[in-house]
Regions:
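Bacterial N-terminal signal peptides that target proteins for export
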Residues: 2-14
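Well-ordered alpha-helical scaffold segments within catalytic/enzyme domains
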Residues: 31-33, 91-107, 173-187, 238-255, ...
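Alpha-helical positions within canonical tetratricopeptide repeat
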Residues: 106-110, 189, 193, 256-259, ...
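Loop-centered beta-sheet repeat module
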Residues: 227-281
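Long, repeat-rich segments with strong aromatic
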Residues: 292-361
């Protein structure tokens, strides 16, 4: 999930319900229906249109894509200036993987090349990190520019602290993009950069207090960055999958893989410790102390991604889909948080992807919901509502739960829809249903 911005800086439901409840075994994939096929075509077209829009006249070379691009349609709230021209790393990683699923390797590599350059040539700290966001467009400079804007009235440069920070999950997703690209077309720079990103998380976010794992990353301006001391189930799942994949890739090339194997085990062990067997669901992670498990909240992605990624031992977790159905259902789709206040398009697409992986198909109602969110510019709205909440804070300076999604066309939502509709698993680089093991009923 990408965090958009700081508020301070600024009759089908039953069918879908039956599809989620009680899933215990993977089924052979069924043939996609007409809606799913159309959604695959249209979401892939939306991603290609995003590339064409943001590249300007540069038809080759590294490229970052804008995360939120208003369609200026009725029902869209006023756009937040802090998001104008911001290319969130998570959204771009997803878009690159989805472009691979759409058969557009050349466009996917342009995003991967931008990530490689960003890691090698950070604006101030070339230590192997990526920032949470960059300036969208062709990357023509040696050091990719960070987002921001000139405020003529104040006569000062305005930037966003979250956007220039480094969240652990975003680092892992950048690595997953490069691993998908390397698998599609072996490229030494992609694998080497993925290893460097994972090394950064080991050196900078490993936290052995409480349940051993990886904390949230680093937040703030370069001269005053501080650790995000909480640990996230989702972030650790991302690291576990990226590290395990990297270990396999370097081992295949005859290189030592012990570091990545250890990292994968550490992160996956953390995910396993967040499983609540009595409630049959995952906790979202820990509190700020990095040790106390946060038991109240529930994040949709934290429930779904372990099932889509399907690491060894994941059969014990399949019943979390019952929790999702009971506590994340919103209309024909699903919301971000427990007892949600609206549909989260991206998360609803994640549910579709998980159903395709675990059951071989997702319900028609869900595909139709996703299709209904297409904006005039080809991207898909982050939510059908004007605004939905997540129950989470953006950073340590937040005074409350200030992380929201708004009804703006969103690159990340579009990418997840493309992944779900094409049946492509971003955690493995393969067709989802062919990779997920069957589980005993």
């Amino acid at each position: 999930m990408s965090i958009p911005f700081s508020s301070r800086a600024v009759a089908r439901c039953a069918a879908a319900s039956m599809a989620l409840a009680g899933i215990a075994a993977a089924a052979p994939p069924s043939s996609p229906g007409a809606t799913q096929k159309a959604l695959a075509r249209e979401s892939c077209d939306g991603l290609r249109r995003a590339v064409a829009h943001d590249q300007g006249g540069a038809t080759s070379g590294p490229l970052f894509l804008t995360s939120y691009r208003p369609a200026n349609a009725q029902g869209e709230p006023p756009f937040e200036p802090a998001l104008a021209g911001a290319a969130f790393t998570y959204d771009n990683a997803l878009a690159g993987i989805a472009l691979l699923a759409c058969g557009d390797r050349a466009a996917a590599r342009r995003i991967g090349d931008a990530v490689v350059r960003a890691v090698a040539h950070d604006q101030t700290t070339p230590d192997g990190r990526v920032r949470n966001a960059y300036r969208a467009g062709p990357v023509t400079e040696e050091k990719p520019a960070l987002p921001g804007r000139w405020d003529a009235g104040r006569k000062q440069w305005i930037a966003d602290a979250y956007q220039v920070s480094t969240a652990t999950g975003n680092v892992a997703w950048a690595a997953l993009l490069l691993l998908n690209l390397h698998q599609a077309e072996p490229t030494p720079a992609y694998l080497a950069t993925a290893r460097r990103l994972l090394a950064w998380t080991e050196q900078n976010t490993r936290a052995r207090n409480g349940p051993d794992g990886y904390n949230g990353g680093r937040h703030g301006w370069d001269n005053a960055q501080r650790a995000q001391t909480w640990k996230s189930t989702e972030h650790n799942l991302d690291i576990a999958m990226a590290a395990a994949w990297t270990a396999r890739a370097v081992r295949a090339e005859g290189q030592p893989d012990a570091a990545e194997q250890r990292q994968a085990r550490t992160a996956l062990d953390f995910v396993g410790r967040m499983w609540n067997p009595s409630e049959q669901r995952f906790h979202i992670g820990t509190r700020e102390d990095g040790a106390t498990v946060s038991t109240e909240g529930s994040g949709l992605d934290a429930q779904l991604w372990p099932l889509l990624a399907a690491p060894e031992g994941s059969c014990a977790w399949v019943r979390s889909l019952d929790w999702v159905e009971k506590h994340h259902r919103s209309g024909a789709g699903y919301g971000f948080s427990r007892e949600p206040d609206g549909i989260w398009t991206e998360g609803s697409a994640q549910a579709a992807a998980t159903l395709v992986a675990r059951k071989g198909a997702a319900p028609e109602a869900l595909w139709q919901l996703l299709a209904s969110q297409r904006a005039g510019n080809g991207l898909y709205y982050a939510t059908p509502s004007a605004r939905i909440s997540t129950g989470l804070a953006i950073g340590p300076d937040s005074t409350g739960a200030d992380f929201f999604y708004y009804r703006w066309p969103h690159l990340g939502a579009t990418a997840w829809i493309a992944l779900a509709a094409t049946g492509f698993n971003p955690f493995t680089g393969k067709t989802a249903a062919s990779e997920v093991p069957s589980c005993p009923a």
